[in-house]
Amino acid sequence: MKKVLIITHTRDNECIEIVSENLRKLDARVIRFNVDLYPLEYSLSTCYQDGQWQIFLDHKGTRETLHDVAAVWYRRSHNLADGLNKVLEPEYLSSAHGEIRQTLFGMLEGLHCFQIGRFSQYRRLDSKEEQMKIASGLGLKVPDTCITNSPEEARRFVQAHPAGAIAKMQSSFAIYREGVEHVVFTNVITEDNLDTIETLQYCPMQFQEKIEKARELRITIVGDAVYCFAVDSQRIENAKVDWRREGLELLEQWDPYELPEEIKEKLLRLMDVYQINYGAIDIIVNPEGEYYFLEINSAGEYFWLDRLIQGQISEQIAKVLLGEAPRRFQPITLGEPTFSM
């Protein structure tokens, strides 16, 4: 029986259990590693002795061997080492967190089995700048862009785009003020905003030309399978710039969309460049029918779209993990280490 390791956390959504159930139907054994409980409730050990490598995951009296897993799905590592601040003195926290990350991600990098996407490849995707350079190199349209912490450069960019510009962060995060979460969304920026832009010096932002939208696309790629959905975000005023502001309102408004073959092939080549088998891609279709690539997210959400097609995406993830469906990229490893079975 093949074993599949899923890296996630206790507050992840329903997709984990749906994929796990699909894996079990294919006669696989699922090991779920909730990394928010590591290291307080989990122990992770990698040992080399007598010419053999062994990896053990211990949790509540149960020991799992990881050196013999057939595949890994690195879903997310949110809240890694949650609660550590309650048991360690503040002066040790930074060092401990560093060692925890090194141990977990070092173990994952050293697992010579199929992985839908390696952590190192996903970290490469953190560079929105490289994403756009690669996408444009593949022939995809990308918006005019300026990534800067220079207020003067930002002013020049906005003034050069009188039809409109937007400002957004390169990473997803929220600001907590008086215990309330404030998600940072994409916003329109005009010359009127430029008088208050001096604080940009302390935190870079990404500025782009404002693309008029006929449709917004979310494309989920798993192996060779491409699932494309479209939404008319312009029907709701508060969703026109960033549809996530009205994500719940638009939840049932997404429809399957036939992506042009030329665009599909370029997106698959993008996956090959990054050597990954999962990606969630955002694209704008303008009124002239032109496709503008915005970004690819290595762990982009898909569950609300999965519901619209009776769980086909989750089923495909399970099949790709087990080699029951075509894999877009399979690693070639030289000098395989010897693992104890």
Each model region followed by its residue ranges:
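Short hydrophobic segments within beta-strands
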Residues: 6-7, 222
